[in-house]
Structure formats: structure tokens, C-alpha cells
Amino acid sequence: MNSIEFPLLNQTTQNSVISTTSNDLSNWSRLSSLWPLLYGTSCCFIEFASLIGSRFDFDRYGLVPRSSPRQADLILTAGTVTMKMAPSLVRLYEQMPEPKYVIAMGACTITGGMFSTDSYSTVRGVDKLIPVDVYLPGCPPKPEAVIDAITKLRKKVSREIYEDRVGSQQETRCFTINHKFRVGRSTHTGNYDQGLLYQSPSISEIPYENETFLKYKIAVSSHKLVN
């Protein structure tokens, strides 16, 4: 059995029979076979490649790297994401079947890193494009930190409830526990809010300089006649 604890797990009745729920059984099967899609763009991905060797042996977690997003349920982004690469990353995420998860690995992926300083072509955080489940800081993170991030993601999967996940998918585009998205008004429809635009004052509100000057001149003339 997996070492992950389930909150809804009942007591063991016999040595070969375990009483549990279908939701916990589904979560256990998914966390034991996470298939990641590796999206590496810079040096952070080299640290993840060291997990393939026998020293860390990431096969013990059921990780099977896939080259197609349609066969993956986890995308691991490592490295800088540029504006030109952003549409491709979002397209890969949308092609992944539900439920799906994201691990942001490295400072360049989380905040843009040193490449985002005074740069117009770098995305300052991958969470501006896709929802992130686990943040993994470091430049670059150690392989032990990657294993810890995967362990935290497995614990998160074990606590998910199917009804909450389905209800959230009906309201928003994606589901995560850390991020609470809400449907907002689109700003790229071409229709701008007229209240935010500059409105020039009407002609009646503009004071006429000649009219003011004539009133002043008439007042001065009448004052002289009285004297």
C-alpha cells in the first residue's frame, strides 16, 4: 500500500480487506501513477534530469515521462518562459486531460528570474498563464527539492474530493486548491468601458473669454459714468 494517509479511510476489517471510499481509491490510483510532461527551457531542467538515474530513482513514485500532453496529468515547467512561448505553453496545458496539475520549478519560472529585469519579452511568473499547484524555488533547485515537491503534490491529490473538482470545472477553466479563480469580464473584446475613457467637456461648459472680457469692460464703463 502507498504511504499516503487518506482522511476518509475507515478501519481495516481483515488483513486482506480494506474499507474505504471510491473517491479515496481514485485518488490513491492517480497519485501512484503521475505521468509528467517535461517542459524544460533552461538549466533547471538539468537538475530534474538527474532524477532519472539510479541515485534518486524517480520511478519509485510512478513517474512516467510522456511526450504528449494528451497522455500526461502533470506538467513540470522549468526555466524562463518568454512571451513567444506563452501561447504554446497554454495550448499544452489545455490539451491535458482532467484532472491535471502544474509544478513550477526554479526562480525563472516562478518570478521570471534575472531575465525579467527590464525585459519586455519575458513572462514574470508562469502562474500568469496557467494555475500552479506546487511552487519549487531555487536557482536551480536540488533533486531532493524536486522529490519533496512531488511528495507534496501527492498529498494534495490524496485530499481531493471529486464533487468539489467537478463543480469548480463547471464554473472556471481549471481547478486547483491553492488558486481560487473567478469568472471576470474579458478585456480583449474591443469594447471599452466608456466610463473609463476621457470625455471632453461640452461647449456650454467652456467659458467664453471674449464674453467675460466684455462683461468686465461694461462694468468698468458703467462705474466711470456713475462717478
From Swiss-Prot:
<comment type="subunit">
    <text>NDH is composed of at least 16 different subunits, 5 of which are encoded in the nucleus.</text>
</comment>
<keyword id="KW-0472">Membrane</keyword>
<dbReference type="GO" id="GO:0008137">
    <property type="term" value="F:NADH dehydrogenase (ubiquinone) activity"/>
</dbReference>
<dbReference type="GO" id="GO:0009535">
    <property type="term" value="C:chloroplast thylakoid membrane"/>
</dbReference>
<feature type="binding site">
    <location>
        <position position="108"/>
    </location>
    <ligand>
        <name>[4Fe-4S] cluster</name>
    </ligand>
</feature>
<dbReference type="GO" id="GO:0019684">
    <property type="term" value="P:photosynthesis, light reaction"/>
</dbReference>
<keyword id="KW-0520">NAD</keyword>
<dbReference type="GO" id="GO:0005506">
    <property type="term" value="F:iron ion binding"/>
</dbReference>
<keyword id="KW-1278">Translocase</keyword>
<keyword id="KW-0874">Quinone</keyword>
<dbReference type="GO" id="GO:0015990">
    <property type="term" value="P:electron transport coupled proton transport"/>
</dbReference>
<feature type="binding site">
    <location>
        <position position="139"/>
    </location>
    <ligand>
        <name>[4Fe-4S] cluster</name>
    </ligand>
</feature>
<keyword id="KW-0813">Transport</keyword>
<dbReference type="InterPro" id="IPR006138">
    <property type="entry name" value="NADH_UQ_OxRdtase_20Kd_su"/>
</dbReference>
<protein>
    <recommendedName>
        <fullName>NAD(P)H-quinone oxidoreductase subunit K, chloroplastic</fullName>
        <ecNumber>7.1.1.-</ecNumber>
    </recommendedName>
</protein>
<feature type="binding site">
    <location>
        <position position="43"/>
    </location>
    <ligand>
        <name>[4Fe-4S] cluster</name>
    </ligand>
</feature>
<keyword id="KW-0411">Iron-sulfur</keyword>
<dbReference type="Pfam" id="PF01058">
    <property type="entry name" value="Oxidored_q6"/>
</dbReference>
<keyword id="KW-0934">Plastid</keyword>
<keyword id="KW-0521">NADP</keyword>
<keyword id="KW-0408">Iron</keyword>
<dbReference type="InterPro" id="IPR006137">
    <property type="entry name" value="NADH_UbQ_OxRdtase-like_20kDa"/>
</dbReference>
<keyword id="KW-0479">Metal-binding</keyword>
<keyword id="KW-0793">Thylakoid</keyword>
<keyword id="KW-0004">4Fe-4S</keyword>
<comment type="function">
    <text>NDH shuttles electrons from NAD(P)H:plastoquinone, via FMN and iron-sulfur (Fe-S) centers, to quinones in the photosynthetic chain and possibly in a chloroplast respiratory chain. The immediate electron acceptor for the enzyme in this species is believed to be plastoquinone. Couples the redox reaction to proton translocation, and thus conserves the redox energy in a proton gradient.</text>
</comment>
<dbReference type="GO" id="GO:0045271">
    <property type="term" value="C:respiratory chain complex I"/>
</dbReference>
<dbReference type="GO" id="GO:0009060">
    <property type="term" value="P:aerobic respiration"/>
</dbReference>
<keyword id="KW-0150">Chloroplast</keyword>
<dbReference type="GO" id="GO:0048038">
    <property type="term" value="F:quinone binding"/>
</dbReference>
<keyword id="KW-0618">Plastoquinone</keyword>
<comment type="similarity">
    <text>Belongs to the complex I 20 kDa subunit family.</text>
</comment>
<feature type="binding site">
    <location>
        <position position="44"/>
    </location>
    <ligand>
        <name>[4Fe-4S] cluster</name>
    </ligand>
</feature>
<dbReference type="GO" id="GO:0051539">
    <property type="term" value="F:4 iron, 4 sulfur cluster binding"/>
</dbReference>
